[in-house]
């Protein structure tokens, strides 16, 4: 038997079937770096319209985790897709480099400031440590395939950025937003510092909840207020309820709601006052069965009544506040303005003292009666003891409730009044302006707007000062007597900023005030506080986005995890509005957190942590990138080894599709061999039209940041339109027709258009694989797919031509029906080419199918395909309902004809040629004649 293998156009490509991504990706990265890929891309994109994505800086401490990987990959997908859409989309990565976590790490190495090391040496060590962390994280981010200016990232500890951070503070001061105040702030005794809102986490905690009697000083006055002449004897007390007994030494008042009804309740030989709605549950808790309401009044009627502190020798007033609720307790709120935000606000109205008997270490100050030197959390038991001894305790019980904790130490925090610097939310109308600015921004998902509006509406003034060493200084001089800022503060801030540009923050810490103030120095105190790190990152719109030539304000997009509504999105918004009256961004996109396959939070103790480093070292970065793109990031993002394995399977489908296309473009030179649409076969025009429809979906989804839709559509295109139909059908034409025939060049033209488009669809997501594909596509090309824009060579199928989209949709439907019957043959170890198919249908469908003539068999991939009227169907024909509501009857039989060894079709004309007796007629034509003619498929 003659071997006809050399007469076939068998697929050939250098593009390997296996990705071997873990090995190949680092080689590609090294090549891109050597070729200065990012720099060249900037040159290619110069002059295009800008797209600015501002990078929220990760903290320069520790290894990157899967959440970091998700964030950086999403940003990279956006930047690359905007580049392909024709924008100049630079990416400047950044790092947050100051603050407590770095201090804690450095303390472990060299000790605490003032003990083992001086402050300047400590800050130097912090800078060195942060730089090491940046270098480590930078390598991990680059390994993910993230393209950016890794040689010139921004660091919040860069001298220039530190200087511009100080200038940003100066601008905020000039516009009237800074204030000094003794206010209660979140305070972590372990940090020894105030915490920002974003540094507070709420966790469940068991506390001592107590109900306490505050004796009424003038009982007759109170009875008059309750419209009572009197009801027996016995003391009258207002009962408060609190879960922080340790704050009672700082009590200055008891607060009631002006519009609630309060009841005077007779219990045994005493009378208690509390909210009427809470009388029944309270008496039940106390175990008082003989309680009887003897009088009522509105809260407003009790304003100004005097009570006696339960264990200190002082009177406290009844005051009114809208914050009092009936959710728990008694409706009477113990008020200590030094230990709570609501207490502080209501206390301002009544001129109450902001008393804070607690030191920065969380211990009561010397001179605090009863409790001096005790830790506040340990003092709860002692407070209860003192109350019990004085007969002031009604009830003490344990309560499990949500309580603020330090995000670093995971320990309960306290509210503590301290002298701090604040960005005021009311002064100069910052809150009002910020709420207006929020409405000008596009929030994705949309619920983000309501979330940040709620947070900005309800948030307290922003405490921006910290009592730390490693941070940007608050470079102010305060008059020792008046407490006012130096009158030349703007000029002084600029002078300090210029010094910081040259020497870093050490320029402030080592500064002798006389150098700037001259003889005034003796009258002023140099502020030693540092800025909250959320201020550092929050002003990057001014220190980075507005300063780097390739960026610019406002940023088109901020993209971070959904926790950043209370973090970076908010600190950026407030500082930008404070500085220039507008938001720093046009759109804000948030992604959910990563969880395991069961929806559980990841933790080392559960053993469910997925480390990005391990994923890229085993599966490759493109698999991780594909998982990110395939997952709806608007909700929680589930990841596990099994999920990543499924992602790798999907990757293989797309890779194999690309490989098939490339392998069948062997010998094709687009400049020489590409056909015009009118010269192409209808099936090939249909394939290009399908690719165009996919491209419209893909580019639209990239624009809307709906990456999971891209994954679904492209994967589906590879599996269904291409894998299950088009590529299957054209194999025969590709392999068996003459190499330079119109039939083959038509299919190659379609495949060329498809791979040119597809490589661009994949490039933002499968960055390594796309570049690998790019190098193998025939024809002249530049060095990177990213140096191009979306492919413009696709074209639509003319709806007026006979073989339009509806025609091919019908063919697909028929083919599926035939395939179901073919499966029975395959189960018997036969192929569809071993079969002959008879189709029985109504006239309209028969006309459609007959339109393909002899070529129907190629579409159905069978040796013979015959069309008959429905009425002539035999009993063993199998009925299949079609999409249009009609029926098709199919009969599949084994062919009795000989099999052509070249095309594997069973044909009756085998042996007709004496020169090639084994071949079928068309193979003879393709081997020895002018080649077969194909008109449709």
UniProtKB/Swiss-Prot annotation:
Record InterPro entries: aa-tRNA-synth_I_CS, aa-tRNA-synth_Ia, Anticodon_Ile_BEm, Ile-tRNA-ligase, Ile-tRNA-ligase_type1, Ile-tRNA_ligase, M/V/L/I-tRNA-synth_anticd-bd, Rossmann-like_a/b/a_fold
Broad class of the protein's primary localization: cytoplasm
Binding positions (Zn(2+)): 900, 903, 920, 923
Disulfide bonds: none
Protein name per the record: Isoleucine--tRNA ligase
Name of the coding gene: ileS
Chain positions of motif 'KMSKS' region: 601-605
Binding of L-isoleucyl-5'-AMP, residues: 560
One of the protein's GO biological processes: isoleucyl-tRNA aminoacylation
First-tier enzyme category under EC: ligase
Signal peptide from the UniProt entry: none
A Pfam cross-reference name: Anticodon_1
Subunit structure, as described in the record: Monomer.
Family recorded in the similarity comment: Belongs to the class-I aminoacyl-tRNA synthetase family. IleS type 1 subfamily.
UniProt keyword annotation of Cytoplasm present: yes
Keywords linked to the UniProt accession: Aminoacyl-tRNA synthetase, ATP-binding, Cytoplasm, Ligase, Metal-binding, Nucleotide-binding, Protein biosynthesis, Zinc
Ranges spanned by the short sequence motif 'HIGH' region, renumbered to the chain: 58-68
